[in-house]
């Protein structure tokens, strides 16, 4: 650089003009200072001072194509068959394609991904709960239908049981009345006495059954007492029938039993109509028997009184026996239907209890899932706040110390 020579400056001592040589000022010495280095008085670098951590190598790194393929395969294997697979695949490109130069961006994207995954898991759990709730409601509707059927069957069983009771009492009373007539007329004192005994046992059997239904006799006692009374009643009835009508009574009883066995289905189908007419039949039995005896007496005047009484008693016992068999068959069928409906109802209740336990378990898992989601979000917010505080502290530090 050349010097400039001027003549317009004077010295303060003599006032004469002397040439003045002006030289440019030297440029200041500039040195580069690295963060964390301090200079001493001599201009050297001191080893003490504020030292900032070096940036991580992953900040400036990029995901290679091979690493991206491995990440994609891993996520596909994990998320295969789940409802959130589409959502995760949408975020794979976000996490693997952008340059990880900004930790803040990575944290924000990671937080969004975790939040969306938790929402998907919640939706899946809620869908499972709704599905189980619908199944539970279907079970409840089925149970209500079963309960209605059970109530209807119980009513029908009650009606058929009432009809069976009516015929049971009618048989017992008819046996006593016919036996008394036979004893009083002298036609068959022994057979009449047997019929009276059979009727008395029948009435005792009906009274014991009624007491058991009222709770006066325990079920354990009825399991022993009921079959015994029934067997005695049947035995006395058979003996009195044989003694009254002779050997032909056995064939008659066999024919009646065969007819009842062959016509059980049709009789059961017509049981409802017959049950409705039970009262009419029971009230008209005595009139029918009386008119039958009168007609038989008028038509066969030459017959003896013994034949008339036997014919009337046979007609009465056959009519009452057939009615009793029909009502007993209907009653047994209704009892079986009632037990079947009760079994179905108990099974449906067990299924409902199992579904309710599954719903409760899903609710617990959903609550745990919500709690874990809240904890993860709190952790992410803490990380973001800590990162912000660190950046704020770094921005507030002086460049030199």
UniProtKB/Swiss-Prot annotation:
Know the name of this protein? Type 3 secretion system translocon protein SctE
Where is it localised? Answer: Secreted; Host membrane
Q: Which family does it belong to?
A: Belongs to the SctE/SipB/YopB family.
Q: What happens when the gene is disrupted?
A: Mutant displays reduced virulence in a mouse model system. Although the mutation abolishes all YopB/SctE synthesis, it does not interfere with either type III secretion or type III targeting. Deletion mutant cannot form channels in liposomes. Mutant can secrete YopE during a HeLa cell infection but it is unable to translocate YopE into the HeLa cell.
Task: Name residues in a coiled coil.
Answer: 129-160, 345-379
The membrane spanning regions, by residue number, are: 166-186, 225-245
* Domain of life, per lineage: Bacteria
Task: Please give the function described in this protein's UniProt entry.
Answer: Component of the type III secretion system (T3SS), also called injectisome, which is used to inject bacterial effector proteins into eukaryotic host cells. YopB/SctE and YopD/SctB are inserted into the host membrane where they form a pore and allow the translocation of effector proteins into the cytosol of target cells. Is an essential virulence determinant. Required for YopE translocation.
Pfam families (alphabetical): SseC
User: Organism, per UniProt?
Assistant: Yersinia enterocolitica
Keyword Acetylation applies: no
Q: What is its main location?
A: secreted
Q: What are the protein's UniProt keywords?
A: Coiled coil, Host membrane, Membrane, Plasmid, Secreted, Transmembrane, Transmembrane helix, Virulence
Q: Describe the subunit structure.
A: The core secretion machinery of the T3SS is composed of approximately 20 different proteins, including cytoplasmic components, a base, an export apparatus and a needle. This subunit is involved in the formation of a pore, called the translocon, in host membrane. Interacts with YopD/SctB. Together with YopD/SctB, forms a multimeric integral membrane complex with a mass of between 500 and 700 kDa.
- Entry's Gene Ontology cellular component terms: extracellular region; host cell membrane; membrane
Q: What's its membrane topology? A: Multi-pass membrane protein
